[in-house]
Design a protein with these regions (language model features):
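C-terminal alpha-helical cap/extension of soluble enzyme domains
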Residues: 8-16, 33, 37-39, 199-200, ...
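Active-site beta->alpha loop and helix N-cap motifs at the rims of alpha/beta catalytic domains
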Residues: 2-11, 15-143
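Glycine-rich phosphate-binding "P-loop"
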Residues: 137, 159-160, 270-271
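Gly/Ser/Thr-rich beta-alpha loop segments that engage phosphate groups in nucleotides
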Residues: 10, 48-51, 81-83, 145, ...
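Catalytic alpha/beta core domains of metabolic enzymes, predominantly
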Residues: 127-128, 141-247
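A general structural signal for well-ordered alpha-helical segments in protein cores
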Residues: 6, 27, 59, 63, ...
Length: 295
């Protein structure tokens, strides 16, 4: 039986940036606050962390900074995916060497690999890793979908332990869950589908929402695991307005604005990402205030 990397909520943390580079002071404060709020794991340099627009040097520095500061208090999951498989392998080896607890590896984007190509790619990365590998399926961003039968093949690899499912296709996710049961954990990759995926046997969520509400997002999962399914469902439904506001523009544009309003760095993004439209930002902040946040 493979070990589960985490149960509950893992925050896909933003990477605070400014015109000079990474704002490590704000990043450290964000990490400490997340841990103090009871988050179950932290994902670094993923989609929300703008891993695709960090330089290679920045990417490695951000990973090492997080591993060193977190110091084993919660699992650190390193975003090491790329559409260049050799680079993904190199970054995975580096993340293993500095003590990251697991890797989050997105499907190769733009290249549009076949299912056989995905099997060979993820196998090569997992073979090179000394730590657990979590697959990341987000076809709306990558143009590439990991089909259930492909997950079933990959679930046989001893280092491939889970999948972050952000396809949004509950029927597909249910089919995957049926095929990989006991061999691969499933995490929701969409904040509006946390409870539906938990009901299919999911182990939690890799979340954007938990940047803003780490304790509540974790509790949504834990309530479900305790058998308090109505509480968990109600928390999911109660959060929908905020979730929708956090995704009214492409992630991480809205959450970057939200975290800046909460004092965790500047609302600074790198092209091709641009700051949130003023009317959308005003609506987001109004909704955050409705949820009791002082922004």
């Amino acid at each position: 039986m493979k070990n589960t990397v985490f149960t509950g909520a893992a925050t896909a943390v933003v990477t605070p940036l400014n015109k000079n580079g990474v704002d490590y002071e704000a990043f450290e404060r964000l990490i400490e606050w997340q841990i103090s709020e009871g988050i179950d794991a932290i994902v670094v340099a993923g989609t929300t962390g703008e891993g695709s627009t960090l330089t290679d040097e920045e990417h490695r520095q951000v990973l090492k900074f997080a591993v060193d500061k977190i110091a084993g208090r919660v699992p650190v999951i390193a975003g090491t995916g790329s559409n260049d498989t050799s680079y993904a392998i190199d970054l995975t080896k580096y993340a293993c060497s500095i003590g990251a607890d697991a890797m989050l590896v997105v499907t190769p984007y733009y290249n549009k690999a076949t299912q056989n190509g995905l099997i060979k790619t993820f196998t090569a990365i997992a073979d090179a890793s000394t730590k657990p590998v979590i697959l990341y399926n987000v076809p709306s961003r990558t143009g590439c979908n990991i089909l259930p039968k492909t997950c079933a093949v990959l679930a046989e690899h001893p280092n491939i332990v889970a999948i972050k499912e952000a396809s949004g296709n509950i029927s597909q996710i249910a089919e995957t869950a049926a095929l990989v049961k006991g061999k691969m954990d499933i995490y929701s990759g969409n904040d509006d589908q946390i409870v539906p995926i938990l009901s299919l046997g999911g182990k939690g969520v890799i979340s954007v929402l938990s940047n803003v509400f780490p304790r509540e997002t974790s509790e949504m999962c834990k309530a479900f695991f305790r058998g308090e399914t109505e509480k968990s469902r109600d928390m999911q439904l109660d959060m929908l307005d905020l979730i929708n506001a956090l995704f009214c523009e492409v992630n991480p544009i809205p959450v970057k604005a939200a975290m800046a309003a909460m004092g965790y760095g500047e609302n600074f993004l790198r092209l091709p990402l641009t700051p949130m439209e003023p009317e959308h930002e005003a609506n987001l902040l109004a909704i955050m205030r409705k949820y009791g946040l002082n922004v």
